[in-house]
Amino acid sequence: MDTKHFLPLDFSTQVNSSSLNSPTGRGSMAVPSLHPSLGPGIGSPLGSPGQLHSPISTLSSPINGMGPPFSVISSPMGPHSMSVPTTPTLGFGTGSPQLNSPMNPVSSTEDIKPPLGLNGVLKVPAHPSGNMASFTKHICAICGDRSSGKHYGVYSCEGCKGFFKRTVRKDLTYTCRDNKDCLIDKRQRNRCQYCRYQKCLAMGMKREAVQEERQRGKDRNENEVESTSSANEDMPVEKILEAELAVEPKTETYVEANMGLNPSSPNDPVTNICQAADKQLFTLVEWAKRIPHFSELPLDDQVILLRAGWNELLIASFSHRSIAVKDGILLATGLHVHRNSAHSAGVGAIFDRVLTELVSKMRDMQMDKTELGCLRAIVLFNPDSKGLSNPAEVEALREKVYASLEAYCKHKYPEQPGRFAKLLLRLPALRSIGLKCLEHLFFFKLIGDTPIDTFLMEMLEAPHQAT
């Protein structure tokens, strides 16, 4: 059934208006589909919400599943493996004058020196003993310090690794003041750079490995810059932030007053919340039209998406607006609802969930307006909304928001590699709370105790009639 016929005239007119069409980007970006596990139970709130044993179970549109957003999370700790050879070599065999003790092949790492002239590199036996192989993995083949792993083909410490890398990258040339046979050990490795570098080569460090590493890093950085730039051009976070700022009431219009104490407002906090929601539904349409590419969708699809996500979109807004409020929420009308008022009105449980699962988490991570706008855009572009003419197009727009948000987090908060995932983890709570709020609203509508204005009533009634 065509859901737009259930919208009031104002709603359809606002959605159809072209005066506020958002600027659009061009081109598209394919977001890699990675699927790191975020632990059991994380994805379930965003999957199928299940059957609600309440009157709200008949509301199909607002409670469609969002689909898991985690498929695009690139875990910073993805699977890596390191191949460790079972027969490492020191680079000098038993024929070396430095390893000629019959009692102990390596009596002291300080005795290891490069051979005179360094014209040839002698090899250790092809199959050293197990103890010897284990030992060489834990010491630096150049200076005898603790090895941090295999670098450029040789087990070495961070100091010798860095020295060799700098020498190769800067193409440095050294000279020896003695006879080119200086002792290179942990204490004296910095005394002669020439002999240290020659020993790196003698032990098997490869210059080409440094150059390949540098090229790989350069290619990776160029790809990241290109990817970030492409994502932001397609779904610019600046436009999403502009949409948030355009519809958010100015701070000075807020009135710091409890619901029950404000003589100009009803004593019932539920009534005030419903009235505030009704007013915000008008601005919600204006906000959506400012989100890039939303106005390019078919009009029917725009209506479907707004109907499916209006409750979560409004909850996200007033939750973020309430970050500075203690034990309460701040409505767009400027009214402050304290948790005591909510408990006295019988909605304390859901109110406490808003405070602990949304407001508190947003406050702790200091979620900014751009991040809030991106999360709301993710909610808006819900490809699982019933009745969409082209769900794939909506899903592509959602993935563009994911990409832009991830790029924004990496750029703005480089010291917080897990911030993008932490933001997405607020969506399950938002979905669950949104469903519970719909149950409450539908119950209030049925019993008729709470005045529900026309726009909000239309949102509640239309999906019910369409099912």
UniProtKB/Swiss-Prot annotation:
PROSITE patterns from the UniProt entry: NR_LBD, NUCLEAR_REC_DBD_1, NUCLEAR_REC_DBD_2
Residues involved in 9-cis-retinoate binding: 321, 332
Variant or mutagenesis effect after changing residue 44 to A: No effect on constituitive phosphorylation
Gene that produces this protein: Rxra
Modified sites of kind N6-acetyllysine: 150
Annotated segments matching region Hinge: 206-229
Tissues and organs where the protein is expressed, per its UniProt entry: Expressed in macrophages (at protein level).
Molecular function in Gene Ontology: chromatin DNA binding; DNA binding; DNA-binding transcription factor activity; identical protein binding; nuclear receptor activity; nuclear steroid receptor activity; RNA polymerase II cis-regulatory region sequence-specific DNA binding; RNA polymerase II intronic transcription regulatory region sequence-specific DNA binding
Upregulation: Down-regulated by infection with viruses, such as VSV, HSV-1 and MHV68. Down-regulated by aging.
Residue span of region Disordered: 1-112, 211-233
CDD domains per record: NR_DBD_RXR (cd06956), NR_LBD_RXR_like (cd06943)
A biological process from GO: positive regulation of bone mineralization
Post-translational modification summary for this protein: Acetylated by EP300; acetylation enhances DNA binding and transcriptional activity.
Known function: Receptor for retinoic acid that acts as a transcription factor. Forms homo- or heterodimers with retinoic acid receptors (RARs) and binds to target response elements in response to their ligands, all-trans or 9-cis retinoic acid, to regulate gene expression in various biological processes. The RAR/RXR heterodimers bind to the retinoic acid response elements (RARE) composed of tandem 5'-AGGTCA-3' sites known as DR1-DR5 to regulate transcription. The high affinity ligand for retinoid X receptors (RXRs) is 9-cis retinoic acid.
The name this protein goes by in its record: Retinoic acid receptor RXR-alpha
Modified sites of kind Phosphoserine: 22, 28, 61, 75, 134, 264-265
Modified residues (Phosphothreonine): 87
Family according to the record: Belongs to the nuclear hormone receptor family. NR2 subfamily.
Gene3D superfamilies in UniProt: Erythroid Transcription Factor GATA-1, subunit A, Retinoid X Receptor
Positions of the UniProt region annotated as Modulating domain: 1-139
Keywords recorded for this protein, A-Z: Acetylation, Cytoplasm, DNA-binding, Isopeptide bond, Metal-binding, Mitochondrion, Nucleus, Phosphoprotein, Receptor, Transcription, Transcription regulation, Ubl conjugation, Zinc, Zinc-finger
Subunit structure: Homodimer. Heterodimer with RARA; required for ligand-dependent retinoic acid receptor transcriptional activity. Heterodimer with PPARA (via the leucine-like zipper in the LBD); the interaction is required for PPARA transcriptional activity. Heterodimerizes with PPARG. Heterodimerizes (via NR LBD) with RARB. Heterodimerizes with NR1H4; the heterodimerization enhances the binding affinity for LXXLL motifs from coactivators. Interacts with coactivator NCO6. Interacts with coactivator NCO3. Interacts with coactivator FAM120B. Interacts with coactivator PELP1, SENP6, SFPQ, DNTTIP2 and RNF8.
Effect after changing residue 61 to A: No effect on constituitive phosphorylation, decreased stress-induced phosphorylation but no effect on RXRA transcriptional activity. Abolishes stress-induced phosphorylation but no effect on RXRA transcriptional activity
